[in-house]
């Protein structure tokens, strides 16, 4: 009879080899597992910080959109609300308060003065814009004038001094936009109005206006970034009135069937 025996030491050695192989297989980790499971702490963004960044971005976009809308509205009002026609016309008037009774009556040429100006009418907004250029012979000053019937204000911009003057609208002298437009249409074929007379206005400069936002869009556009002052009307008379001081501003214009001389003094 043959007895089969096993070497225990050899069996233990084989068992240890099997355990070491299984251990090596368990320690094998795919290379991409490190990239997925392990991150740099500096690269991790907290959830609260990401939310704050999103809110800031949303508010920034909202402010940008609001600025675009407001800017577009201003540009639309600036460019769209333009008059269809600009009237260039003039008026002849007598230098003194003597008026010719007959249209065909003759008078010395030296007694006539001529006023020429550009007139724009914004009928829907009830605004008149008058541009008085530099006169060739008369001793008056160039100016831009705005009559705003909605705000019931008149603004004068002295182009020599680059200063603005604001006063309540005088409806007894200034013809409403609709009526003035009809008058201009009727005389569009001619260059000058029939001979007329001259009205004198004497105004005094008072307080400075620091904020002109409440004066309306058209006056704001006229007087923006310019020194602006209030005016007080001293008197309105027909006939000759001596100039009180050489420092006064004299503006000759018309927005009616007669001419107006506006004297603005300190």
From Swiss-Prot:
The record marks 243-244 as: Cleavage. Disulfide bonds join 164-223, 248-265. GO terms for cellular component: endosome membrane; extracellular space; Golgi apparatus; Golgi membrane; Golgi-associated vesicle membrane; organelle membrane; plasma membrane. Residues 137-231 form the BRICHOS domain. The chain crosses the membrane at residues 55-75. Homodimer; disulfide-linked. Interacts with SPPL2A and SPPL2B. Interacts with APP. Mature BRI2 (mBRI2) interacts with the APP amyloid-beta A4 protein; the interaction occurs at the cell surface and in the endocytic compartments and enable alpha- and beta-secretase-induced APP cleavage inhibition. Mature BRI2 (mBRI2) interacts with the APP C99; the interaction occurs in the endocytic compartments and enable gamma-secretase-induced C99 cleavage inhibition. May form heterodimers with Bri23 peptide and APP amyloid-beta protein 40. One of its GO terms (biological process) is negative regulation of amyloid precursor protein biosynthetic process. One of its GO terms (molecular function) is amyloid-beta binding. Residues 76-266 are lumenal. It comes from Bos taurus. Keywords: Cell membrane, Disulfide bond, Endosome, Glycoprotein, Golgi apparatus, Membrane, Secreted, Signal-anchor, Transmembrane, Transmembrane helix. Residues 1-54 are cytoplasmic. Belongs to the ITM2 family. It comes from the Eukaryota. InterPro entries: BRICHOS_dom (IPR007084), ITM2 (IPR040145). Plays a regulatory role in the processing of the amyloid-beta A4 precursor protein (APP) and acts as an inhibitor of the amyloid-beta peptide aggregation and fibrils deposition. Plays a role in the induction of neurite outgrowth. Functions as a protease inhibitor by blocking access of secretases to APP cleavage sites. Mature BRI2 (mBRI2) functions as a modulator of the amyloid-beta A4 precursor protein (APP) processing leading to a strong reduction in the secretion of secretase-processed amyloid-beta protein 40 and amyloid-beta protein 42. The ectodomain C-terminal part of the imBRI2 is processed by furin producing a secreted Bri23 peptide and a mature BRI2, membrane form (mBRI2). The remaining part of the ectodomain of mBRI2 containing the BRICHOS domain is cleaved by ADAM10 and is secreted (BRI2C, soluble form). The membrane-bound N-terminal fragment (BRI2C, membrane form) is further proteolytically processed by SPPL2A and SPPL2B through regulated intramembrane proteolysis producing a secreted C-peptide and a BRI2 intracellular domain (BRI2 ICD) released in the cytosol. Glycosylation at Asn-170 is important for cell surface localization, but doesn't affect furin- and ADAM10-induced proteolytic processing. It holds the Pfam family BRICHOS. This is Integral membrane protein 2B.
């Amino acid at each position: 009879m043959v007895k089969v025996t096993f070497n225990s030491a050899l069996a233990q050695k084989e068992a240890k080899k099997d355990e070491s192989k299984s251990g090596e297989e368990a320690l094998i980790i795919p290379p991409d597992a490190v990239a997925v499971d392990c991150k740099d702490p500096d690269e991790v963004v907290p959830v609260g910080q990401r939310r704050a960044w999103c809110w800031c971005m949303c508010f920034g976009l909202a402010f940008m959109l609001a600025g675009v809308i407001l800017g577009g509205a201003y540009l639309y009002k600036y460019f769209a609300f333009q008059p269809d026609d600009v009237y260039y016309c003039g008026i002849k008037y007598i230098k003194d308060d003597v008026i010719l009774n007959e249209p065909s009556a003759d008078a010395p040429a030296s007694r006539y003065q001529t006023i020429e100006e550009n007139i724009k009418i914004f009928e829907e907004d009830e605004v008149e814009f008058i541009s008085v250029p530099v006169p060739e012979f008369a001793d008056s000053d160039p100016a831009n004038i705005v009559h705003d019937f909605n705000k019931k204000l008149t603004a004068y911009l002295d182009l020599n001094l680059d200063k603005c003057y604001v006063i309540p609208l005088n409806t007894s002298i200034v013809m409403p936009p609709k009526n003035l437009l009809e008058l201009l249409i009727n005389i569009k074929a001619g260059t000058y109005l029939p001979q007329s007379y001259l009205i004198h206005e004497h105004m005094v400069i008072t307080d400075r206006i620091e904020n002109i936002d409440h004066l309306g869009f058209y006056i704001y556009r006229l007087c923006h970034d310019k020194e602006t002052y209030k005016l007080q009307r001293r008197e309105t008379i027909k006939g000759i009135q001596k100039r009180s001081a050489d420092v006064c501003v004299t503006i000759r214009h018309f927005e009616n069937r007669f001419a107006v001389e506006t004297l603005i003094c300190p």
